[in-house]
């Protein structure tokens, strides 16, 4: 299979390796779409904190389920997944704050990601496509970040929300804050 690796800042290389074989508790996915996130841009540019090279980037993904024993999934299913792999054992995980896991492994940041034809992931992070197409599924992760922010801030109809940055997550924040009934103001350094 082909994959793209960021060997060092400012350098992508196209390489080949065998298709990975899923281990117990893992599934094999064929990548169909991938989003380019600010994290990927910063990693490519050499400014992403806690990052080591070489690394296969990519965590905003849409895929086809190929192989594994995940319950409720059939080969050919359209899927995406949660790219934040937590340990389940640390104090944060035990308290339900898996996003604060002290041992978190972010797919495409701490471990190799999805700029590859095929990937294996732990089956517990797999999500059904729910009728979305591959283009839409690649947006699930950034939109989930936006939805989480609006929910965590407990945005109400009486609120005025300032969104700083009108990239994909910012656009998601705008829409979710409007759904919550808030007045929204947007700032960005890019005029377009």
Regions found by a protein language model. Name each.
Residues 2, 26-28, 160:
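Residues that mark the start of a beta-strand
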Residues 132-192:
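Mid-domain Rossmann-like dinucleotide-binding core that forms the NAD(H)/NADP(H) cofactor-binding site
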Residues 20-34, 47-91, 130-132:
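Glycine-rich beta-strand-centered segment in the early N-terminal region that forms part
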Residues 7, 18-19, 52-58, 107-111:
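Short Gly/Pro-enriched turn/cap motifs at secondary-structure boundaries
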Residues 39-41:
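Cytochrome P450 core scaffold surrounding the K-helix E-X-X-R motif
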Residues 8-10, 23:
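Residue-level recognition of beta-strand termini and adjacent short loop/turns
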Residues 60, 77-78, 92, 118, ...:
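Residue-level marker of beta-strand positions
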Residues 37, 72, 83-130:
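Cysteine-cluster motifs in flexible loop/terminal segments that predominantly coordinate metals
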């Amino acid at each position: 299979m082909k994959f793209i690796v960021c060997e060092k800042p400012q350098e992508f290389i196209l390489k080949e390796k065998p298709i990975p074989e899923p281990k117990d508790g893992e599934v094999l996915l064929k990548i169909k779409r991938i989003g380019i996130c600010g994290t990927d841009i910063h990693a490519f540019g050499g400014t992403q904190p806690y990052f080591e090279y070489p690394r296969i980037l990519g965590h905003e993904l849409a895929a086809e389920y190929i192989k594994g024993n995940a319950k409720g999934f059939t080969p050919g299913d359209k899927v995406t997944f949660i790219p934040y792999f937590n340990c389940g054992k640390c104090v944060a995980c035990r308290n339900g704050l898996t996003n604060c896991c002290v041992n978190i492994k972010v797919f495409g940041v701490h471990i190799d990601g999805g700029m590859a034809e095929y990937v294996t992931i732990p089956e517990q992070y797999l999500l059904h496509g729910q009728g979305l197409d591959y283009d839409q599924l690649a947006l699930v992760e950034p939109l989930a970040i936006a939805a989480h922010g609006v929910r965590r801030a407990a945005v109400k109809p009486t609120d005025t929300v300032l969104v700083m940055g009108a990239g994909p997550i910012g656009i998601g924040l705008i829409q979710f804050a409007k759904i919550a009934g808030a007045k929204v103001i947007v700032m960005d350094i890019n005029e377009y």
